[in-house]
Amino acid sequence: MEASSPLDPVGRLVAFCRGGVHLAVLLLFLSPSTLGQCPAPPLFPYAKPINPTDESTFPVGTSLKYECRPGYIKRQFSITCEVNSVWTSPQDVCIRKQCETPLDPQNGIVHVNTDIRFGSSITYTCNEGYRLIGSSSAMCIISDQSVAWDAEAPICESIPCEIPPSIPNGDFFSPNREDFHYGMVVTYQCNTDARGKKLFNLVGEPSIHCTSIDGQVGVWSGPPPQCIELNKCTPPHVENAVIVSKNKSLFSLRDMVEFRCQDGFMMKGDSSVYCRSLNRWEPQLPSCFKVKSCGAFLGELPNGHVFVPQNLQLGAKVTFVCNTGYQLKGNSSSHCVLDGVESIWNSSVPVCEQVICKLPQDMSGFQKGLQMKKDYYYGDNVALECEDGYTLEGSSQSQCQSDASWDPPLPKCVSQVICKLPQDMSGFQKGLQMKKDYYYGDNVALECEDGYTLEGSSQSQCQSDASWDPPLPKCVSRSNSGLIAGIFIGIIVLILFIIFSYWMIMKFKKRNSTNEKCKEVGIYLNSKEDSCVQPQSLLTSQENNSTSSPARNSLTQEV
């Protein structure tokens, strides 16, 4: 390979041409400032160019002349494009012309916001009790070749009021009864008789004055008083309360008025008042004060949620809800209630306890070797199987639910014991739905046919030992039952007859034996006592009773 030799003159010329092309392309993309030019000059709100132009670029050193716009003191100035492609900035070249100094209107004030030069504004206000007639503001504007205010100064006029309202049985007094303006006071009085005796009570403020709410229209400071007949009362007024009893324009002595506070307010004092003399209400009128809202509910509920309403006023309700798998222990809500004059929450935060499902205590029939727990929680599963000799009724798999129940319900292990009905079913109704075999827990209902009597319970259940509880009944023929009853009664009568006969025989034998003994000893028999007595005593007894009837049942025996 040969080493490269220096460029010959032709090569140097080619390289130079290529470099020139590159430079030309680069110059095409350079900004005007790089080439020594200024962009279009800025617009001035206070001046305009003397010779307007549509050029967008200007070479360095170009000067443009401007003159002040109307409203400004006329003066020419110029700006120049500097070498850094920036226009020079004019300062304090156009000064705004000044309007005449405004004067305060009578009974008013003028307010100069900034100054009184071209473009500035001023405002007018009236003194208290006066209203503004005309424009409330003015601006310094161009007027012909000068500047002037665009509106004349307004007038401040005294605020007028209408004629005071008249009242029955009275009148107002004022120095002027035709012209009423702001600040004037009128006083009311009630009529009297020819001798000046008082006939009415003046109820309310005796004097009212002319005032204004909006500074334009005059109004009286309050309602006029009333001239009320003696021993009458005007309707009482309680702020934030309503009258629930019958309302009237006038109340007589001892009339009652009952109040109720509006929602959100609590009453302090008696709700009922009575009309007394001199337009007095007794006891003192109540007051209705605004009930404060309950404070923010700050309690938290682990494993649950607390739902708090936006409005925490009286009656607001906070609700507690446990997460799935937990059950609420305590109140499910708390209410904002009144405690004296304070608003409080009436319940604290409850507790969310984990749901526990339990197996039944009686697990007879289930396999003992199964892995069973004492407590099962929400979502836990249990599998149950029966021992030999038992049949599983239900699903062998069950899951603990959020309400502590099992789904599907826990199965049962039913013994395979079979209870049978007796072979002799004579006397029982043939149309009964009876099965051949009954299993543990099955029930049977039996009834007898006509002519038979059911002895025992008509309902019976198959037990785990293949017996019936209560025992199965019997159907006994009614004829047999009558015969048995007759025999039973005859036996009872016979037994009673034998007992009575035996008693009579024994009594007769005892009396005969006593008589024989009395004969042997020569004494008398006393039939009342079935005993022997001495003859002398018996004789004495007979003599004493000679006036009466002879002794009954006495026997004598000669010796």
UniProtKB/Swiss-Prot annotation:
<keyword id="KW-0732">Signal</keyword>
<keyword id="KW-0217">Developmental protein</keyword>
<feature type="domain" description="Sushi 2">
    <location>
        <begin position="97"/>
        <end position="158"/>
    </location>
</feature>
<feature type="disulfide bond">
    <location>
        <begin position="190"/>
        <end position="227"/>
    </location>
</feature>
<feature type="disulfide bond">
    <location>
        <begin position="99"/>
        <end position="140"/>
    </location>
</feature>
<dbReference type="GO" id="GO:0045916">
    <property type="term" value="P:negative regulation of complement activation"/>
</dbReference>
<comment type="similarity">
    <text>Belongs to the receptors of complement activation (RCA) family.</text>
</comment>
<feature type="disulfide bond">
    <location>
        <begin position="126"/>
        <end position="156"/>
    </location>
</feature>
<keyword id="KW-0472">Membrane</keyword>
<feature type="domain" description="Sushi 1">
    <location>
        <begin position="36"/>
        <end position="96"/>
    </location>
</feature>
<feature type="signal peptide">
    <location>
        <begin position="1"/>
        <end position="35"/>
    </location>
</feature>
<feature type="topological domain" description="Extracellular">
    <location>
        <begin position="36"/>
        <end position="482"/>
    </location>
</feature>
<dbReference type="InterPro" id="IPR051277">
    <property type="entry name" value="SEZ6_CSMD_C4BPB_Regulators"/>
</dbReference>
<feature type="modified residue" description="Phosphoserine">
    <location>
        <position position="537"/>
    </location>
</feature>
<dbReference type="GO" id="GO:0009897">
    <property type="term" value="C:external side of plasma membrane"/>
</dbReference>
<feature type="disulfide bond">
    <location>
        <begin position="357"/>
        <end position="400"/>
    </location>
</feature>
<keyword id="KW-1015">Disulfide bond</keyword>
<dbReference type="GO" id="GO:0009986">
    <property type="term" value="C:cell surface"/>
</dbReference>
<dbReference type="GO" id="GO:0016323">
    <property type="term" value="C:basolateral plasma membrane"/>
</dbReference>
<feature type="transmembrane region" description="Helical">
    <location>
        <begin position="483"/>
        <end position="503"/>
    </location>
</feature>
<feature type="topological domain" description="Cytoplasmic">
    <location>
        <begin position="504"/>
        <end position="559"/>
    </location>
</feature>
<keyword id="KW-0180">Complement pathway</keyword>
<dbReference type="GO" id="GO:0005615">
    <property type="term" value="C:extracellular space"/>
</dbReference>
<keyword id="KW-0597">Phosphoprotein</keyword>
<feature type="domain" description="Sushi 4">
    <location>
        <begin position="231"/>
        <end position="290"/>
    </location>
</feature>
<feature type="disulfide bond">
    <location>
        <begin position="386"/>
        <end position="413"/>
    </location>
</feature>
<feature type="domain" description="Sushi 5">
    <location>
        <begin position="292"/>
        <end position="354"/>
    </location>
</feature>
<dbReference type="GO" id="GO:0045959">
    <property type="term" value="P:negative regulation of complement activation, classical pathway"/>
</dbReference>
<dbReference type="GO" id="GO:0001701">
    <property type="term" value="P:in utero embryonic development"/>
</dbReference>
<keyword id="KW-0768">Sushi</keyword>
<feature type="disulfide bond">
    <location>
        <begin position="419"/>
        <end position="462"/>
    </location>
</feature>
<feature type="disulfide bond">
    <location>
        <begin position="448"/>
        <end position="475"/>
    </location>
</feature>
<keyword id="KW-1133">Transmembrane helix</keyword>
<feature type="modified residue" description="Phosphoserine">
    <location>
        <position position="527"/>
    </location>
</feature>
<dbReference type="GO" id="GO:0005886">
    <property type="term" value="C:plasma membrane"/>
</dbReference>
<dbReference type="GO" id="GO:0002456">
    <property type="term" value="P:T cell mediated immunity"/>
</dbReference>
<dbReference type="GO" id="GO:0043235">
    <property type="term" value="C:receptor complex"/>
</dbReference>
<feature type="domain" description="Sushi 7">
    <location>
        <begin position="417"/>
        <end position="477"/>
    </location>
</feature>
<keyword id="KW-0677">Repeat</keyword>
<feature type="region of interest" description="Disordered">
    <location>
        <begin position="535"/>
        <end position="559"/>
    </location>
</feature>
<keyword id="KW-0399">Innate immunity</keyword>
<feature type="domain" description="Sushi 3">
    <location>
        <begin position="159"/>
        <end position="229"/>
    </location>
</feature>
